[in-house]
Amino acid sequence: MRKGVLKDPEIADLFYKDDPEELFIGLHEIGHGSFGAVYFATNAHTNEVVAIKKMSYSGKQTHEKWQDILKEVKFLRQLKHPNTIEYKGCYLKEHTAWLVMEYCLGSASDLLEVHKKPLQEVEIAAITHGALHGLAYLHSHALIHRDIKAGNILLTEPGQVKLADFGSASVASPANSFVGTPYWMAPEVILAMDEGQYDGKVDVWSLGITCIELAERKPALFNMNAMSALYHIAQNDSPTLQSNEWTDSFRRFVDYCLQKIPQERPTSAELLRHDFVRRDRPLRVLIDLIQRTKDAVRELDNLQYRKMKKILFQETRNGPLNESQEDEEDSEHGTSLNREMDSLGSNHSIPSMSVSTGSQSSSVNSMQEVMDESSSELVMMHDDESTINSSSSVVHKKDHVFIRDEAGHGDPRPEPRPTQSVQSQALHYRNRERFATIKSASLVTRQIHEHEQENELREQMSGYKRMRRQHQKQLIALENKLKAEMDEHRLKLQKEVETHANNSSIELEKLAKKQVAIIEKEAKVAAADEKKFQQQILAQQKKDLTTFLESQKKQYKICKEKIKEEMNEDHSTPKKEKQERISKHKENLQHTQAEEEAHLLTQQRLYYDKNCRFFKRKIMIKRHEVEQQNIREELNKKRTQKEMEHAMLIRHDESTRELEYRQLHTLQKLRMDLIRLQHQTELENQLEYNKRRERELHRKHVMELRQQPKNLKAMEMQIKKQFQDTCKVQTKQYKALKNHQLEVTPKNEHKTILKTLKDEQTRKLAILAEQYEQSINEMMASQALRLDEAQEAECQALRLQLQQEMELLNAYQSKIKMQTEAQHERELQKLEQRVSLRRAHLEQKIEEELAALQKERSERIKNLLERQEREIETFDMESLRMGFGNLVTLDFPKEDYR
């Protein structure tokens, strides 16, 4: 999506559709920062006074600027608390976002700038208490401000404390971004990219530094270069209050906030219970402070206005001021100007990459006018005011007037007319009288000048922050890539495991079906064999029975013939008796044969039943053998599959281990490369800073050398004047002495006396001339030596300071490198432990599964054998009941009936 083209409905809902240039009127610049400017304005529909923060999202880093705007708007929309700035809406106009908020008088840093002295402890407690309520609200919703400082703590007319500037805020806690203003940054924020995450306690640290700022007018380490301050904060002890005038309660509060270890640092909710903020204080302490500040600002602005008015009057009457008039004017107002301009204030800090509404913004209301409307020049200015576009502000810089477009798009245009410059300055101070504020006009102008002059330093810090965030994005991108690679790897392994499990299941199903088919086939074969066996026995028995019957018939005939022969030989027995005996014998023989036949049939039936029973037992035993073979085959198959699965899992573990080590090496290599790049950038920035400081000092010394002839000329003129005064005195003394000598000496000696006096005067003048020349030479030599010594001392001091800062940077980088190496060692050890533990778990799992498989094998075989044994035992018991005895020792006849 092209920035500013609101195609996404969710993003479009963040912005109002009205034209802000028509909706808001009377724009007046009241603050300036890296993002642009903050304006006082009035809602044309409701007459409500608001503050407007204009943020351009064109030019360099367009996408980043647009994302910052979206983040800040989303953040502000969800805030509903008395101690956070009230959000009024956001509008878009020509690649500029107009962020509209409630109007406040100014910031806590403005109080320091106006009064030029620290706040009272009771005032610091009141401001801190209000800020803590706002922080506790943010932290309770897992939000982090990340840029707490006096410039971002605003005050309203009724004395309400408001947290502002959420351009650096985080909607996630914990966070891990390098953002904020250097001097107020917590150590864990500075080390965020290197060591991990942080939470809302970073705001507690910043609040502690803010307390030092309010108590000492500057945050800790403010005399350092901003980059050096970062290195100092990251590795040195926490700062403390320097003066002994503060109470122990305040000192403990600051020390409590500035605990180096985040886990030992209190939360904002815990700090609300601290004695420092809970103790009694006047209800109007902030209202009175604001009123005193407003009065002081009014006096400063009136002083500036009167100066402009006087210059205007003199210029109108006499033309441009001469040098002496300017000197006189400067001497008249020098004290107030020096008092206004002797401090850079919190604006010396490097603005964060994210935009700020804090020290760069303050609010305005109505105020009394103190202009003298009777003067014709002021009437002229009043008339001219209507011709000045309300969307532009006038900024006086050096010898030109720059017309700055309020939207921040226009380029400065030099106006060569000095009269117009003076009128614009006077008009600027007159317009200031229309609203109440705790920020003086000179402070607003100075912020604009500093913003332009410190662009190089600000760009360096912005570039450093961009680099840190870019490094963090690279690490996150690599971590996500490696995570995706690991997820893909694990998914691949999981699919392979699932495929193996499915294949194993399919193989077992096939084996089960095969075994069922074999059992069914064996059952059919056994049934056929049994039937065949029975038929063979029956056929044989039938054959035996036929043979037996034929044998009986033959035997019957033989016996019959034998009896007949015996009867025929016995002649003594009557024929009838013979017949009876033959019949009886035949009956006995038939009866015997019938019994033998019945016995044979009984024996055949018993033989048939017993052999069929034995055959069934053999079939059952054979079936048992098949079942045993099947279960062994199934269990062997399962064991083979399990061994293949275990080999696959070991291979997976080794491939995962190799991937994990490779990924860790890749991540650590990138981290070390980024740290080397960061350290190289830090070193380059420090060297560039050193060169800039040396150039500035050299430029200053060159200016001093250029200025020295003028100074020497002035001092020479002063000595010359003293010489002239001495000459005049000596001339007067000479005349008085001459007159006296002429009066007291005879006339004839006058010529000699005059000659003597003339020679004496000439001698003394010659001595005086020699003294004059000597004084001039000594003065020039002394001044040259003094300048050389002063410049050499400044050079030595600068070299010492830069050397200390370089040593601080080297120590910081060494510490970061050591911490990173220690972190890498911990990560490697952690990975080794994880890999070792995972391998141990895998081996334990393999052992347990093999043991479970062996146990299953033993139990199933045992259960099968027990079941088969019970089945055989039951069969044998039934055979015994049937009267077959022990079938185990039964032998089949030679004919194999099976």
Swiss-Prot record:
Compositionally skewed regions (Basic and acidic residues) per UniProt: 405-416
Keyword Plastid listed: no
Top class in the EC scheme: transferase
EC number in record: 2.7.11.1
Record PTM text: Autophosphorylated. Phosphorylation at Ser-324 by ATM following DNA damage is required for activation of the p38/MAPK14 stress-activated MAPK cascade. Phosphorylated at Ser-324 and on Tyr residues during T cell activation. Phosphorylated by LRRK2.
Region (Disordered): 316-362, 405-425, 565-596
Protein origin, superkingdom: Eukaryota
CDD domains hit by this protein: STKc_TAO3
Residues that bind ATP: 30-38, 53
GO BP term (any one): mitotic G2 DNA damage checkpoint signaling
Comp. bias regions, Low complexity: 352-362
Keywords assigned: Acetylation, ATP-binding, Cell membrane, Coiled coil, Cytoplasm, DNA damage, DNA repair, Kinase, Lipid droplet, Membrane, Nucleotide-binding, Phosphoprotein, Serine/threonine-protein kinase, Transferase
One cellular-component annotation, GO: cytoplasm
Modified residues (N6-acetyllysine): 830
Ranges in a coiled coil: 452-502, 548-649, 754-879
Major localization class: cytoplasm
Localization per Swiss-Prot or TrEMBL: Cytoplasm; Cell membrane; Membrane raft; Lipid droplet
Family recorded in the similarity comment: Belongs to the protein kinase superfamily. STE Ser/Thr protein kinase family. STE20 subfamily.
Record text on subunit structure and interactions: Self-associates. Interacts with ERN1 and TRAF2. Interaction with TRAF2 is facilitated under ER stress conditions, such as treatment with tunicamycin, and may promote TRAF2 phosphorylation. Interacts (via N-terminus) with STK25; the interaction promotes STK25 abundance at the level of protein expression and/or stability.
Protein task: Serine/threonine-protein kinase that acts as a regulator of the p38/MAPK14 stress-activated MAPK cascade and of the MAPK8/JNK cascade. In response to DNA damage, involved in the G2/M transition DNA damage checkpoint by activating the p38/MAPK14 stress-activated MAPK cascade, probably by mediating phosphorylation of upstream MAP2K3 and MAP2K6 kinases. Inhibits basal activity of the MAPK8/JNK cascade and diminishes its activation in response to epidermal growth factor (EGF).
Protein's name in the database: Serine/threonine-protein kinase TAO3
Annotated organism of origin: Pongo abelii
Gene behind the chain: TAOK3
